[in-house]
Amino acid sequence: EIADGRTGGFDAADYVAWFREISKRTAEMIVHWQRVGFVHGVMNTDNMSIHGLTIDYGPYGWLEDYNPGWTPNTTDREYKRYRFGAQPHIGQWNCTQLANAIYPLVGEVEPLQEALETYVDVFNTDWRRMMGTKLGIAELDGERDSELIHDLLELLPKIETDMTLFFRGLANVSTDDGLDLDARVAPLLGAYYDPDTFTGEVRAETDAWLDRYIARLREEGRVDADRARAMNAVNPLFVLRNYVAQLAIDEADTGDPSLILELLDTLRTPYTEQPGRERFAEKRPEWARVRPGCSMLSCSS
């Protein structure tokens, strides 16, 4: 396509255009990883696709509590190179290695460096827009919204907070100015692994952040129900929780595949509430915190 249908005779400009498209697709893919809390686990260059597709995810997992330093890969436990928070940087690093590999086909560094900037530009733009949609903000407002996003991501790890359930709960936060603080924060309480820790400084910081957030939502003037629908369309209710996957594997090992099939069917519509399947959206139970297969995996798991 880049070469107008030609099957041969590609020149340096064609290879640069090809590389630019790969950088763009890689950035777009990783934005979606960050949106749903997916951790690939082993982002070696040979585990990346030039099509911007998620492949070769062996020791992968989803964030349970929001922890940018988490990786499910036991072999990466010490250095955490491929941790959730590092995935955007690793994506750029991997694209850089591809640029080094195709340099002999291009013969100049500058065009490849310029094409590599596509990754940074696309990721930054799409990530910021993505976070806006997760918060239900239709039109982002420069530095002010960047600070709102930054402060939330700094706040979430202060106590164990289920990422998936927090953003679903945030959709139910009301902009009604007649609510007291307890009623306002109530939709978020189910996301905390130990609600008793939601006190003191963390509670005060959360209340202060909600003040700013609700004020921002009121500026846009959207009806709460419309905003909630938009947020729930980008914030999944169901993800492949590590402990649920292990339970399904355990049952399949006994010859009963029914849980795997039900889980698979549930995940086909991850943004939709599904009566009778609420257990697939529950926080990680305490027993799964350190159980192999639920908290950590190896490449041979």
Question: What kind of feature is each model-predicted range?
Answer:
Residues 1-40, 51-158:
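ATP-dependent phospho-/nucleotidyl transfer catalytic cores
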Residues 26-33, 59-61, 125-134, 155-165, ...:
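Short, charged low-complexity intrinsically disordered segments located at boundaries
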Residues 28, 93-96, 100, 165, ...:
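Generic structural signal for well-ordered, non-membrane alpha-helices
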Residues 45-46, 50:
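Catalytic-loop Lys-Pro-X-Asn motif of eukaryotic-like protein kinases
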Residues 102-111, 174-179, 250-259:
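Short helix-capping/linker segments at secondary-structure and domain boundaries
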Residues 109-235, 242:
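Helix-loop elements that line ligand-binding/catalytic pockets
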Residues 191-301:
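C-terminal amphipathic alpha-helical interaction region
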